[in-house]
Design a protein with these regions (language model features):
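Basic, short loop/linker segments at the boundary and entry of helix-turn-helix/winged-helix-like folds
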Residues: 69, 73-104, 138, 150
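Charged, often Cys/His-bearing segments associated with DNA-binding zinc-finger transcription factors
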Residues: 2-82, 93, 485-496
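A short, flexible helix-boundary coil/loop motif
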Residues: 2-4, 59-63, 83-86, 125-128, ...
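Short amphipathic alpha-helical "interface-anchor" segments enriched in bulky aromatics
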Residues: 399-434
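Active-site-proximal, Lys/Arg-enriched surface segment
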Residues: 150-235
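An anionic, glycine-rich sequence signature occurring as long contiguous blocks
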Residues: 3-10, 18, 308-412
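Electropositive, glycine- and tryptophan-enriched low-complexity nucleic-acid-binding patches
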Residues: 213-280
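Short, conserved catalytic/metal-binding motifs centered on acidic residues
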Residues: 105, 120-121, 145, 149, ...
Length: 506
């Protein structure tokens, strides 16, 4: 006798979908009764083209290209002025392109999200693309071969390129465009590491190494690892700031230890303090940095911090937290979006560390336990829970716990979302572009600088509707294809580009 079929019937599937819709409707009504919710990002529209005529499409493409170009050209004078200070190592008798034109071309290669030097060679040197680039950027009269940029990046000092990036962010901060997104009057900067690429060839002595595989298949792998710093605001705006490459020789050679993320953090924090000596900063760090030397370095730099505290880290701090919480509980319950949150915190916990535990810090610990409801695959409303804990440099209170935790510490994920974008959404973070250490770093810095410009374009009011209509990659593709085809009318574009541009972030 055959077993009964467990596959649901068409009627059963229809009934299950109906039950799920009813449960979701009831759950949404319950959420609305709890109070206002933060607006969720609207999904991309699934519809046919909104352009009814060729003239409408041409006008939309010209407007999009002009707005993006005006944003770039607003910063180009200062940017190119700094890049002109880079000593040019090339033979003056053989130079066909100015150093600034080469670096501008490299920047545009990443702004338009070309995947490789070969693709940028093939696409950007087409006559129509070149004519449009010259219309948008008169500095570009002819385009070089991509290998020319490679040879330049291989030989130049990249300090000026990095400084140009930092000064761009500094002008943005001074312009007060991000003031309403500050946390306790501090600029939230997330720091995290990411692997850039890995392989079995030692093509540069700076590469880190590790053993991969088991027993018979065990082999040495060489890889590039970068510690990144980015401004991470609670509205989703993430602005790349600094990059620190880990190098094999910068480790402890006597103990035969290569470079690590904590050593790189010490170097990156020194550079951050040098570049922004008086900027109020709130560092957002993961659990790796929950240790005495890192927190002491933050105190000496006069920085605030919010650091993830895992259950297995700092047992003495956890022991004192539980003891003091029982004696003098401090708590707050609130709704945040779809989540019900319960905060508990303890201030002024003494933490001893270092040789013979002679060094002391006053820490403040906050724990957030939250729950939310969702509809599962069986059309049942289920409750899910999560628990988060952080170390804070400042005392917690009912007035600041939401801002420091929900709007600050939780948005450390912004830098991880930035890694996702740079790796899988057009910037090709994991592509070396050159098997030369200095050139590879140069391409990386150009990529991060291009990411800044595209991020500003996404959040500026002038291009808001374009990015909402097409999405981020779709909008960049729309602008790129507009430059690659005869869409742009020279007379109208010159008029549009002559208009002043005011950066207004959403």
């Amino acid at each position: 006798m055959s077993k009964p079929c467990r596959r649901p019937t068409r009627a059963g599937l229809r009934e299950e979908r109906g039950n799920k819709r009813r449960q979701e409707k009831a759950l949404n009504a319950k959420r609305c009764a709890m109070g206002p919710r933060p607006p969720a990002p609207a999904p991309l529209p699934n519809r046919c083209s909104t352009f009814a005529t060729l003239a409408e499409e041409r006008e939309a493409r010209e407007d999009a290209v002009s707005q993006q170009t005006r944003l770039l050209r607003k910063e180009l004078p200062a940017l190119l002025g700094q890049l002109e200070q880079i000593p040019d190592p090339r033979d003056p008798r053989k130079r066909q392109h100015k150093l600034t034109v080469l670096l501008l071309w490299g920047l545009l290669m990443f702004v338009f999200q070309f995947a490789s030097r070969r693709e940028s060679n093939r696409e950007m040197t087409r006559p129509q693309f070149l004519a449009n680039l010259h219309l948008l950027f008169p500095e570009i009269e002819t385009l070089p071969h991509a290998d020319t940029l490679y040879r330049l990046l291989r030989d130049i000092d990249l300090t000026h390129l990095e400084q140009a990036h930092v000064d761009l962010v500094r002008r943005l901060i001074r312009g007060k465009s991000v003031r309403r997104y500050l946390i306790n009057h501090c600029h939230p900067i997330a720091i995290d590491g990411s692997q850039k690429l890995a392989g079995d060839t030692l093509w540069a002595e700076e590469l880190l190494q590790r053993s991969v595989g088991k027993d018979e298949t065990r082999q040495t792998q060489y890889f590039v690892y970068v510690l990144e710093a980015s401004l991470a605001f609670h509205n989703g705006l993430v602005i790349p700031l600094l990059s620190e490459f880990l190098e094999h020789a910068l480790g402890d050679t006597e103990a035969q230890k290569q470079d690590c993320e904590l050593r790189a953090f010490a170097r990156l924090s020194d550079r951050l303090k040098t570049r922004f000596p008086r900027l109020p900063i709130l560092l957002l760090l993961d659990g790796l940095y929950a240790n005495g030397p890192v927190m002491q370095r933050c105190w000496r730099a006069h920085w605030q911090f919010m650091i993830v505290l895992k259950n297995q880290d700092l047992p003495s701090v956890w022991q004192e937290f539980h003891a003091l919480q029982a004696l003098k509980p401090q708590a707050l319950q609130r709704n945040w979006g779809r989540r019900r949150q319960h905060f508990t915190w303890v201030n002024d916990i003494d933490y001893a560390f270092g040789s013979n535990r002679r060094q002391h810090l006053k820490l403040h610990v906050v724990v957030c336990e939250e729950s939310w409801e969702r509809v599962d695959q069986q059309a049942q409303i289920v409750t899910q829970t999560a628990r988060h804990a952080w170390l804070s440099s400042q005392p917690l209170s009912r007035e600041n716990v939401h801002e420091r935790c929900n709007l600050g510490a939780r948005h450390r994920w912004g830098i991880e979302a930035g890694f996702l974008v740079e790796k899988h959404q057009g910037y090709h973070y994991e592509h070396a572009f050159a098997l030369d250490w200095n050139a590879m770093r140069g391409y990386h810095l150009l990529m991060r600088l291009a990411h800044v410009f595209n991020t500003l374009a996404r959040f500026t009011r002038q291009l808001r509707d374009l990015f909402r209509q097409f999405g981020v990659r779709g909008a960049i593709r729309f602008i790129r294809t507009s430059c690659a085809a005869p869409w742009l009318d020279s007379a109208r574009m010159r008029g549009l580009l002559a208009e002043p541009f005011l950066l207004q972030l959403e």
